[in-house]
Amino acid sequence: MRIHEFGTEHEKTVLLLHSACLSWRMFQPAAERLQTQYHLIIPALPAHDPDEKTPYTSVEAIAAELGDWLEQRGISALWGLYGVSMGGAVALRLLADGKVAVRTCVLDAAITPYRAPRWLTRGFSLRNYLVIRFAQRHLALIRRAFPAQRFGQAAVEDDCMILGRMDRRDVWRVFDSCFHYPLPKRLQTAARVSYWYGSKEYFQRALDIRHVRRLLPETAFVAFPDCAHAEFVAGQPEAFAARLAETLELDGSDI
């Protein structure tokens, strides 16, 4: 897993974890601003590296590898941890592992594991697998479903490029792992956690919101008006960078 760093001269370290079917490049527009204030660490997660073919492993394996990498680099604490969608699942698993202290964590439409019998939830994995496999064969539909004026041209093309590179095993592992990775019933962390989501995806995220509320009762939930899944970070990078920096700089009295 290759890891990209920006703003290494800064003391405050922020780890950014990208969505499924997009690459680390989704953060490049926002990173132009954020790197003036933070040391940014942006991994290219397995099966999503535009420059290197790597197989997808699992949410928990990725979190463990990142935790080990941070320890080896002597990074014992993160000023901020941000993950969107699949990246949010990895962020949750990092919190559960507890290898690195986190001051502030933002879970943006983070996927949480299903709390239902495995035979049923595997059906949900299959449904999402088939949707993505269909999209891989009809990339024009991706451009139609995610218009560049809302999600940004670069993000839409990045999505199509990553989908074109992923094989069927990677697609299956991504969704099966995101829906079934292990988490404790109650997560103990000193991090201040926010869960972001777009108002247009509320019903898709309702179970995730409920799960996070049980896991982390002190979580602040923030809805972004007129936004779909990952639209705020992908389509409004300047506003996203400003809002993330604002969230990371809150002190205890602001929470």
Which role does the model predict for each range below?
Residues 96, 102-133:
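Flexible "cap/lid" loop of the alpha/beta hydrolase fold
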Residues 189, 195-197:
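Short beta-strand/loop motif that positions the catalytic acidic residue
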Residues 224-238:
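Catalytic histidine-centered segment of alpha/beta-hydrolase-like enzymes
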Residues 116-118, 135-187:
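Conserved alpha/beta-hydrolase catalytic His-Asp/Glu region
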Residues 5-52:
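Conserved HGGG/HGGXW glycine-rich cap/lid loop of the alpha/beta-hydrolase fold
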Residues 199-204, 230:
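Acidic catalytic loop of the alpha/beta-hydrolase fold
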Residues 41-80:
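Active-site loop/oxyanion-hole signature of alpha/beta-hydrolase fold enzymes
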Residues 83-87, 91:
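Gly/Ala-rich beta-loop-alpha elbow adjacent to hydrolase catalytic centers
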